[in-house]
Amino acid sequence: MLNLKKYNQKIKHLLIFSFIYIFSFYSHTNSFPNNLNVPIGFEITIFADELNSPRQITETENGYVIVGSKKGDKIFALYDGDLDGYAEKKILIADGLQNPTGVSFYQGDLYFAEIDTIWVVKNIDDWLDKGSQTLPTKTVFMNDLPSETWHGFKYIDFGPDGNLYIPVGVPCNICLEPQTKDNRFAAIHKYEDGELITVADGVRNSVGFDWHPITKKMYFSDNGRDWLGDDSPSCELNVVDKEGSFFGYPFKHAKNVIDPEFGSMIPTVNKEFIDPIAELGPHVAPLGIAFYDNDVFPKKYKNSIFIALHGSWNRTKKSGYTVVFVKLDDDGNYLYQEDFITGWLSN
């Protein structure tokens, strides 16, 4: 966790996400890995441990941190009641679920996503504050999402427009057929008035997105395809300037990598290809991203992005395993990127 008395919720979420994920197998009494490197003035401590592959997190108005799970079947709330930086309470909210990865808190209610179903628990803070021994009532918000598990984890969040945003990854490394049969694949959608509307198309597998605090434009990460060598293609950071824009998959990757299987079809694709605003590196697997819009950090961090890089799994020399900072200018254009937290590979 970021050890500051005051911090922006979303950046806290990003950092807790990274650290909880890494330290799932550490107990509170174990020594903290001492090889993590952060900029001067920042400090990392363990906020929670002994969790089963936690992924997306969200925070309620009353300060409960809700945690989804990639491999487990439960949703938990974490609570640091004494404000010492460690969550002494872990409260079960739901169980018996299929990979309930995505969680989002909106207008008092908790939303969480399985592979093909999104649930809602109304007035979650009221239930948590009461300390009930009975699980809260959950109701189906929607239950007809694609059920494929390969790139099927659903990361969710509400946008500035009040709609729920849902990415649907492709059930493959590189393919075209699934999208031709079901256009929900390879895209990010918003759920508006009972239907899914495509916000970004040609997206292989996005598991992180956020909105610029000033422009309100949506920025999202995308995981690049595998098996084109150690150094190609790069994973991406994209911005949606126009709803429904096409970002290249499966025909083109990063800024200039033509796919060897589908690239020859580009002349037949009647769409404008949008390049990423930044290449994050090959096989780094970007996960959560978050804008920082508070005034506690040094000025350079404001209205720019932090991205958690899961790290490579099939590269000769490992890459990623960091949190990076992506600096944007006042108009939201990319300037540069730099490491913010490193050292996990040495642990």
Regions found by a protein language model. Give the residues of each.
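Asp-box/WD-like beta-propeller blade repeats and closely related beta-sheet repeat scaffolds
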Residues: 116-158
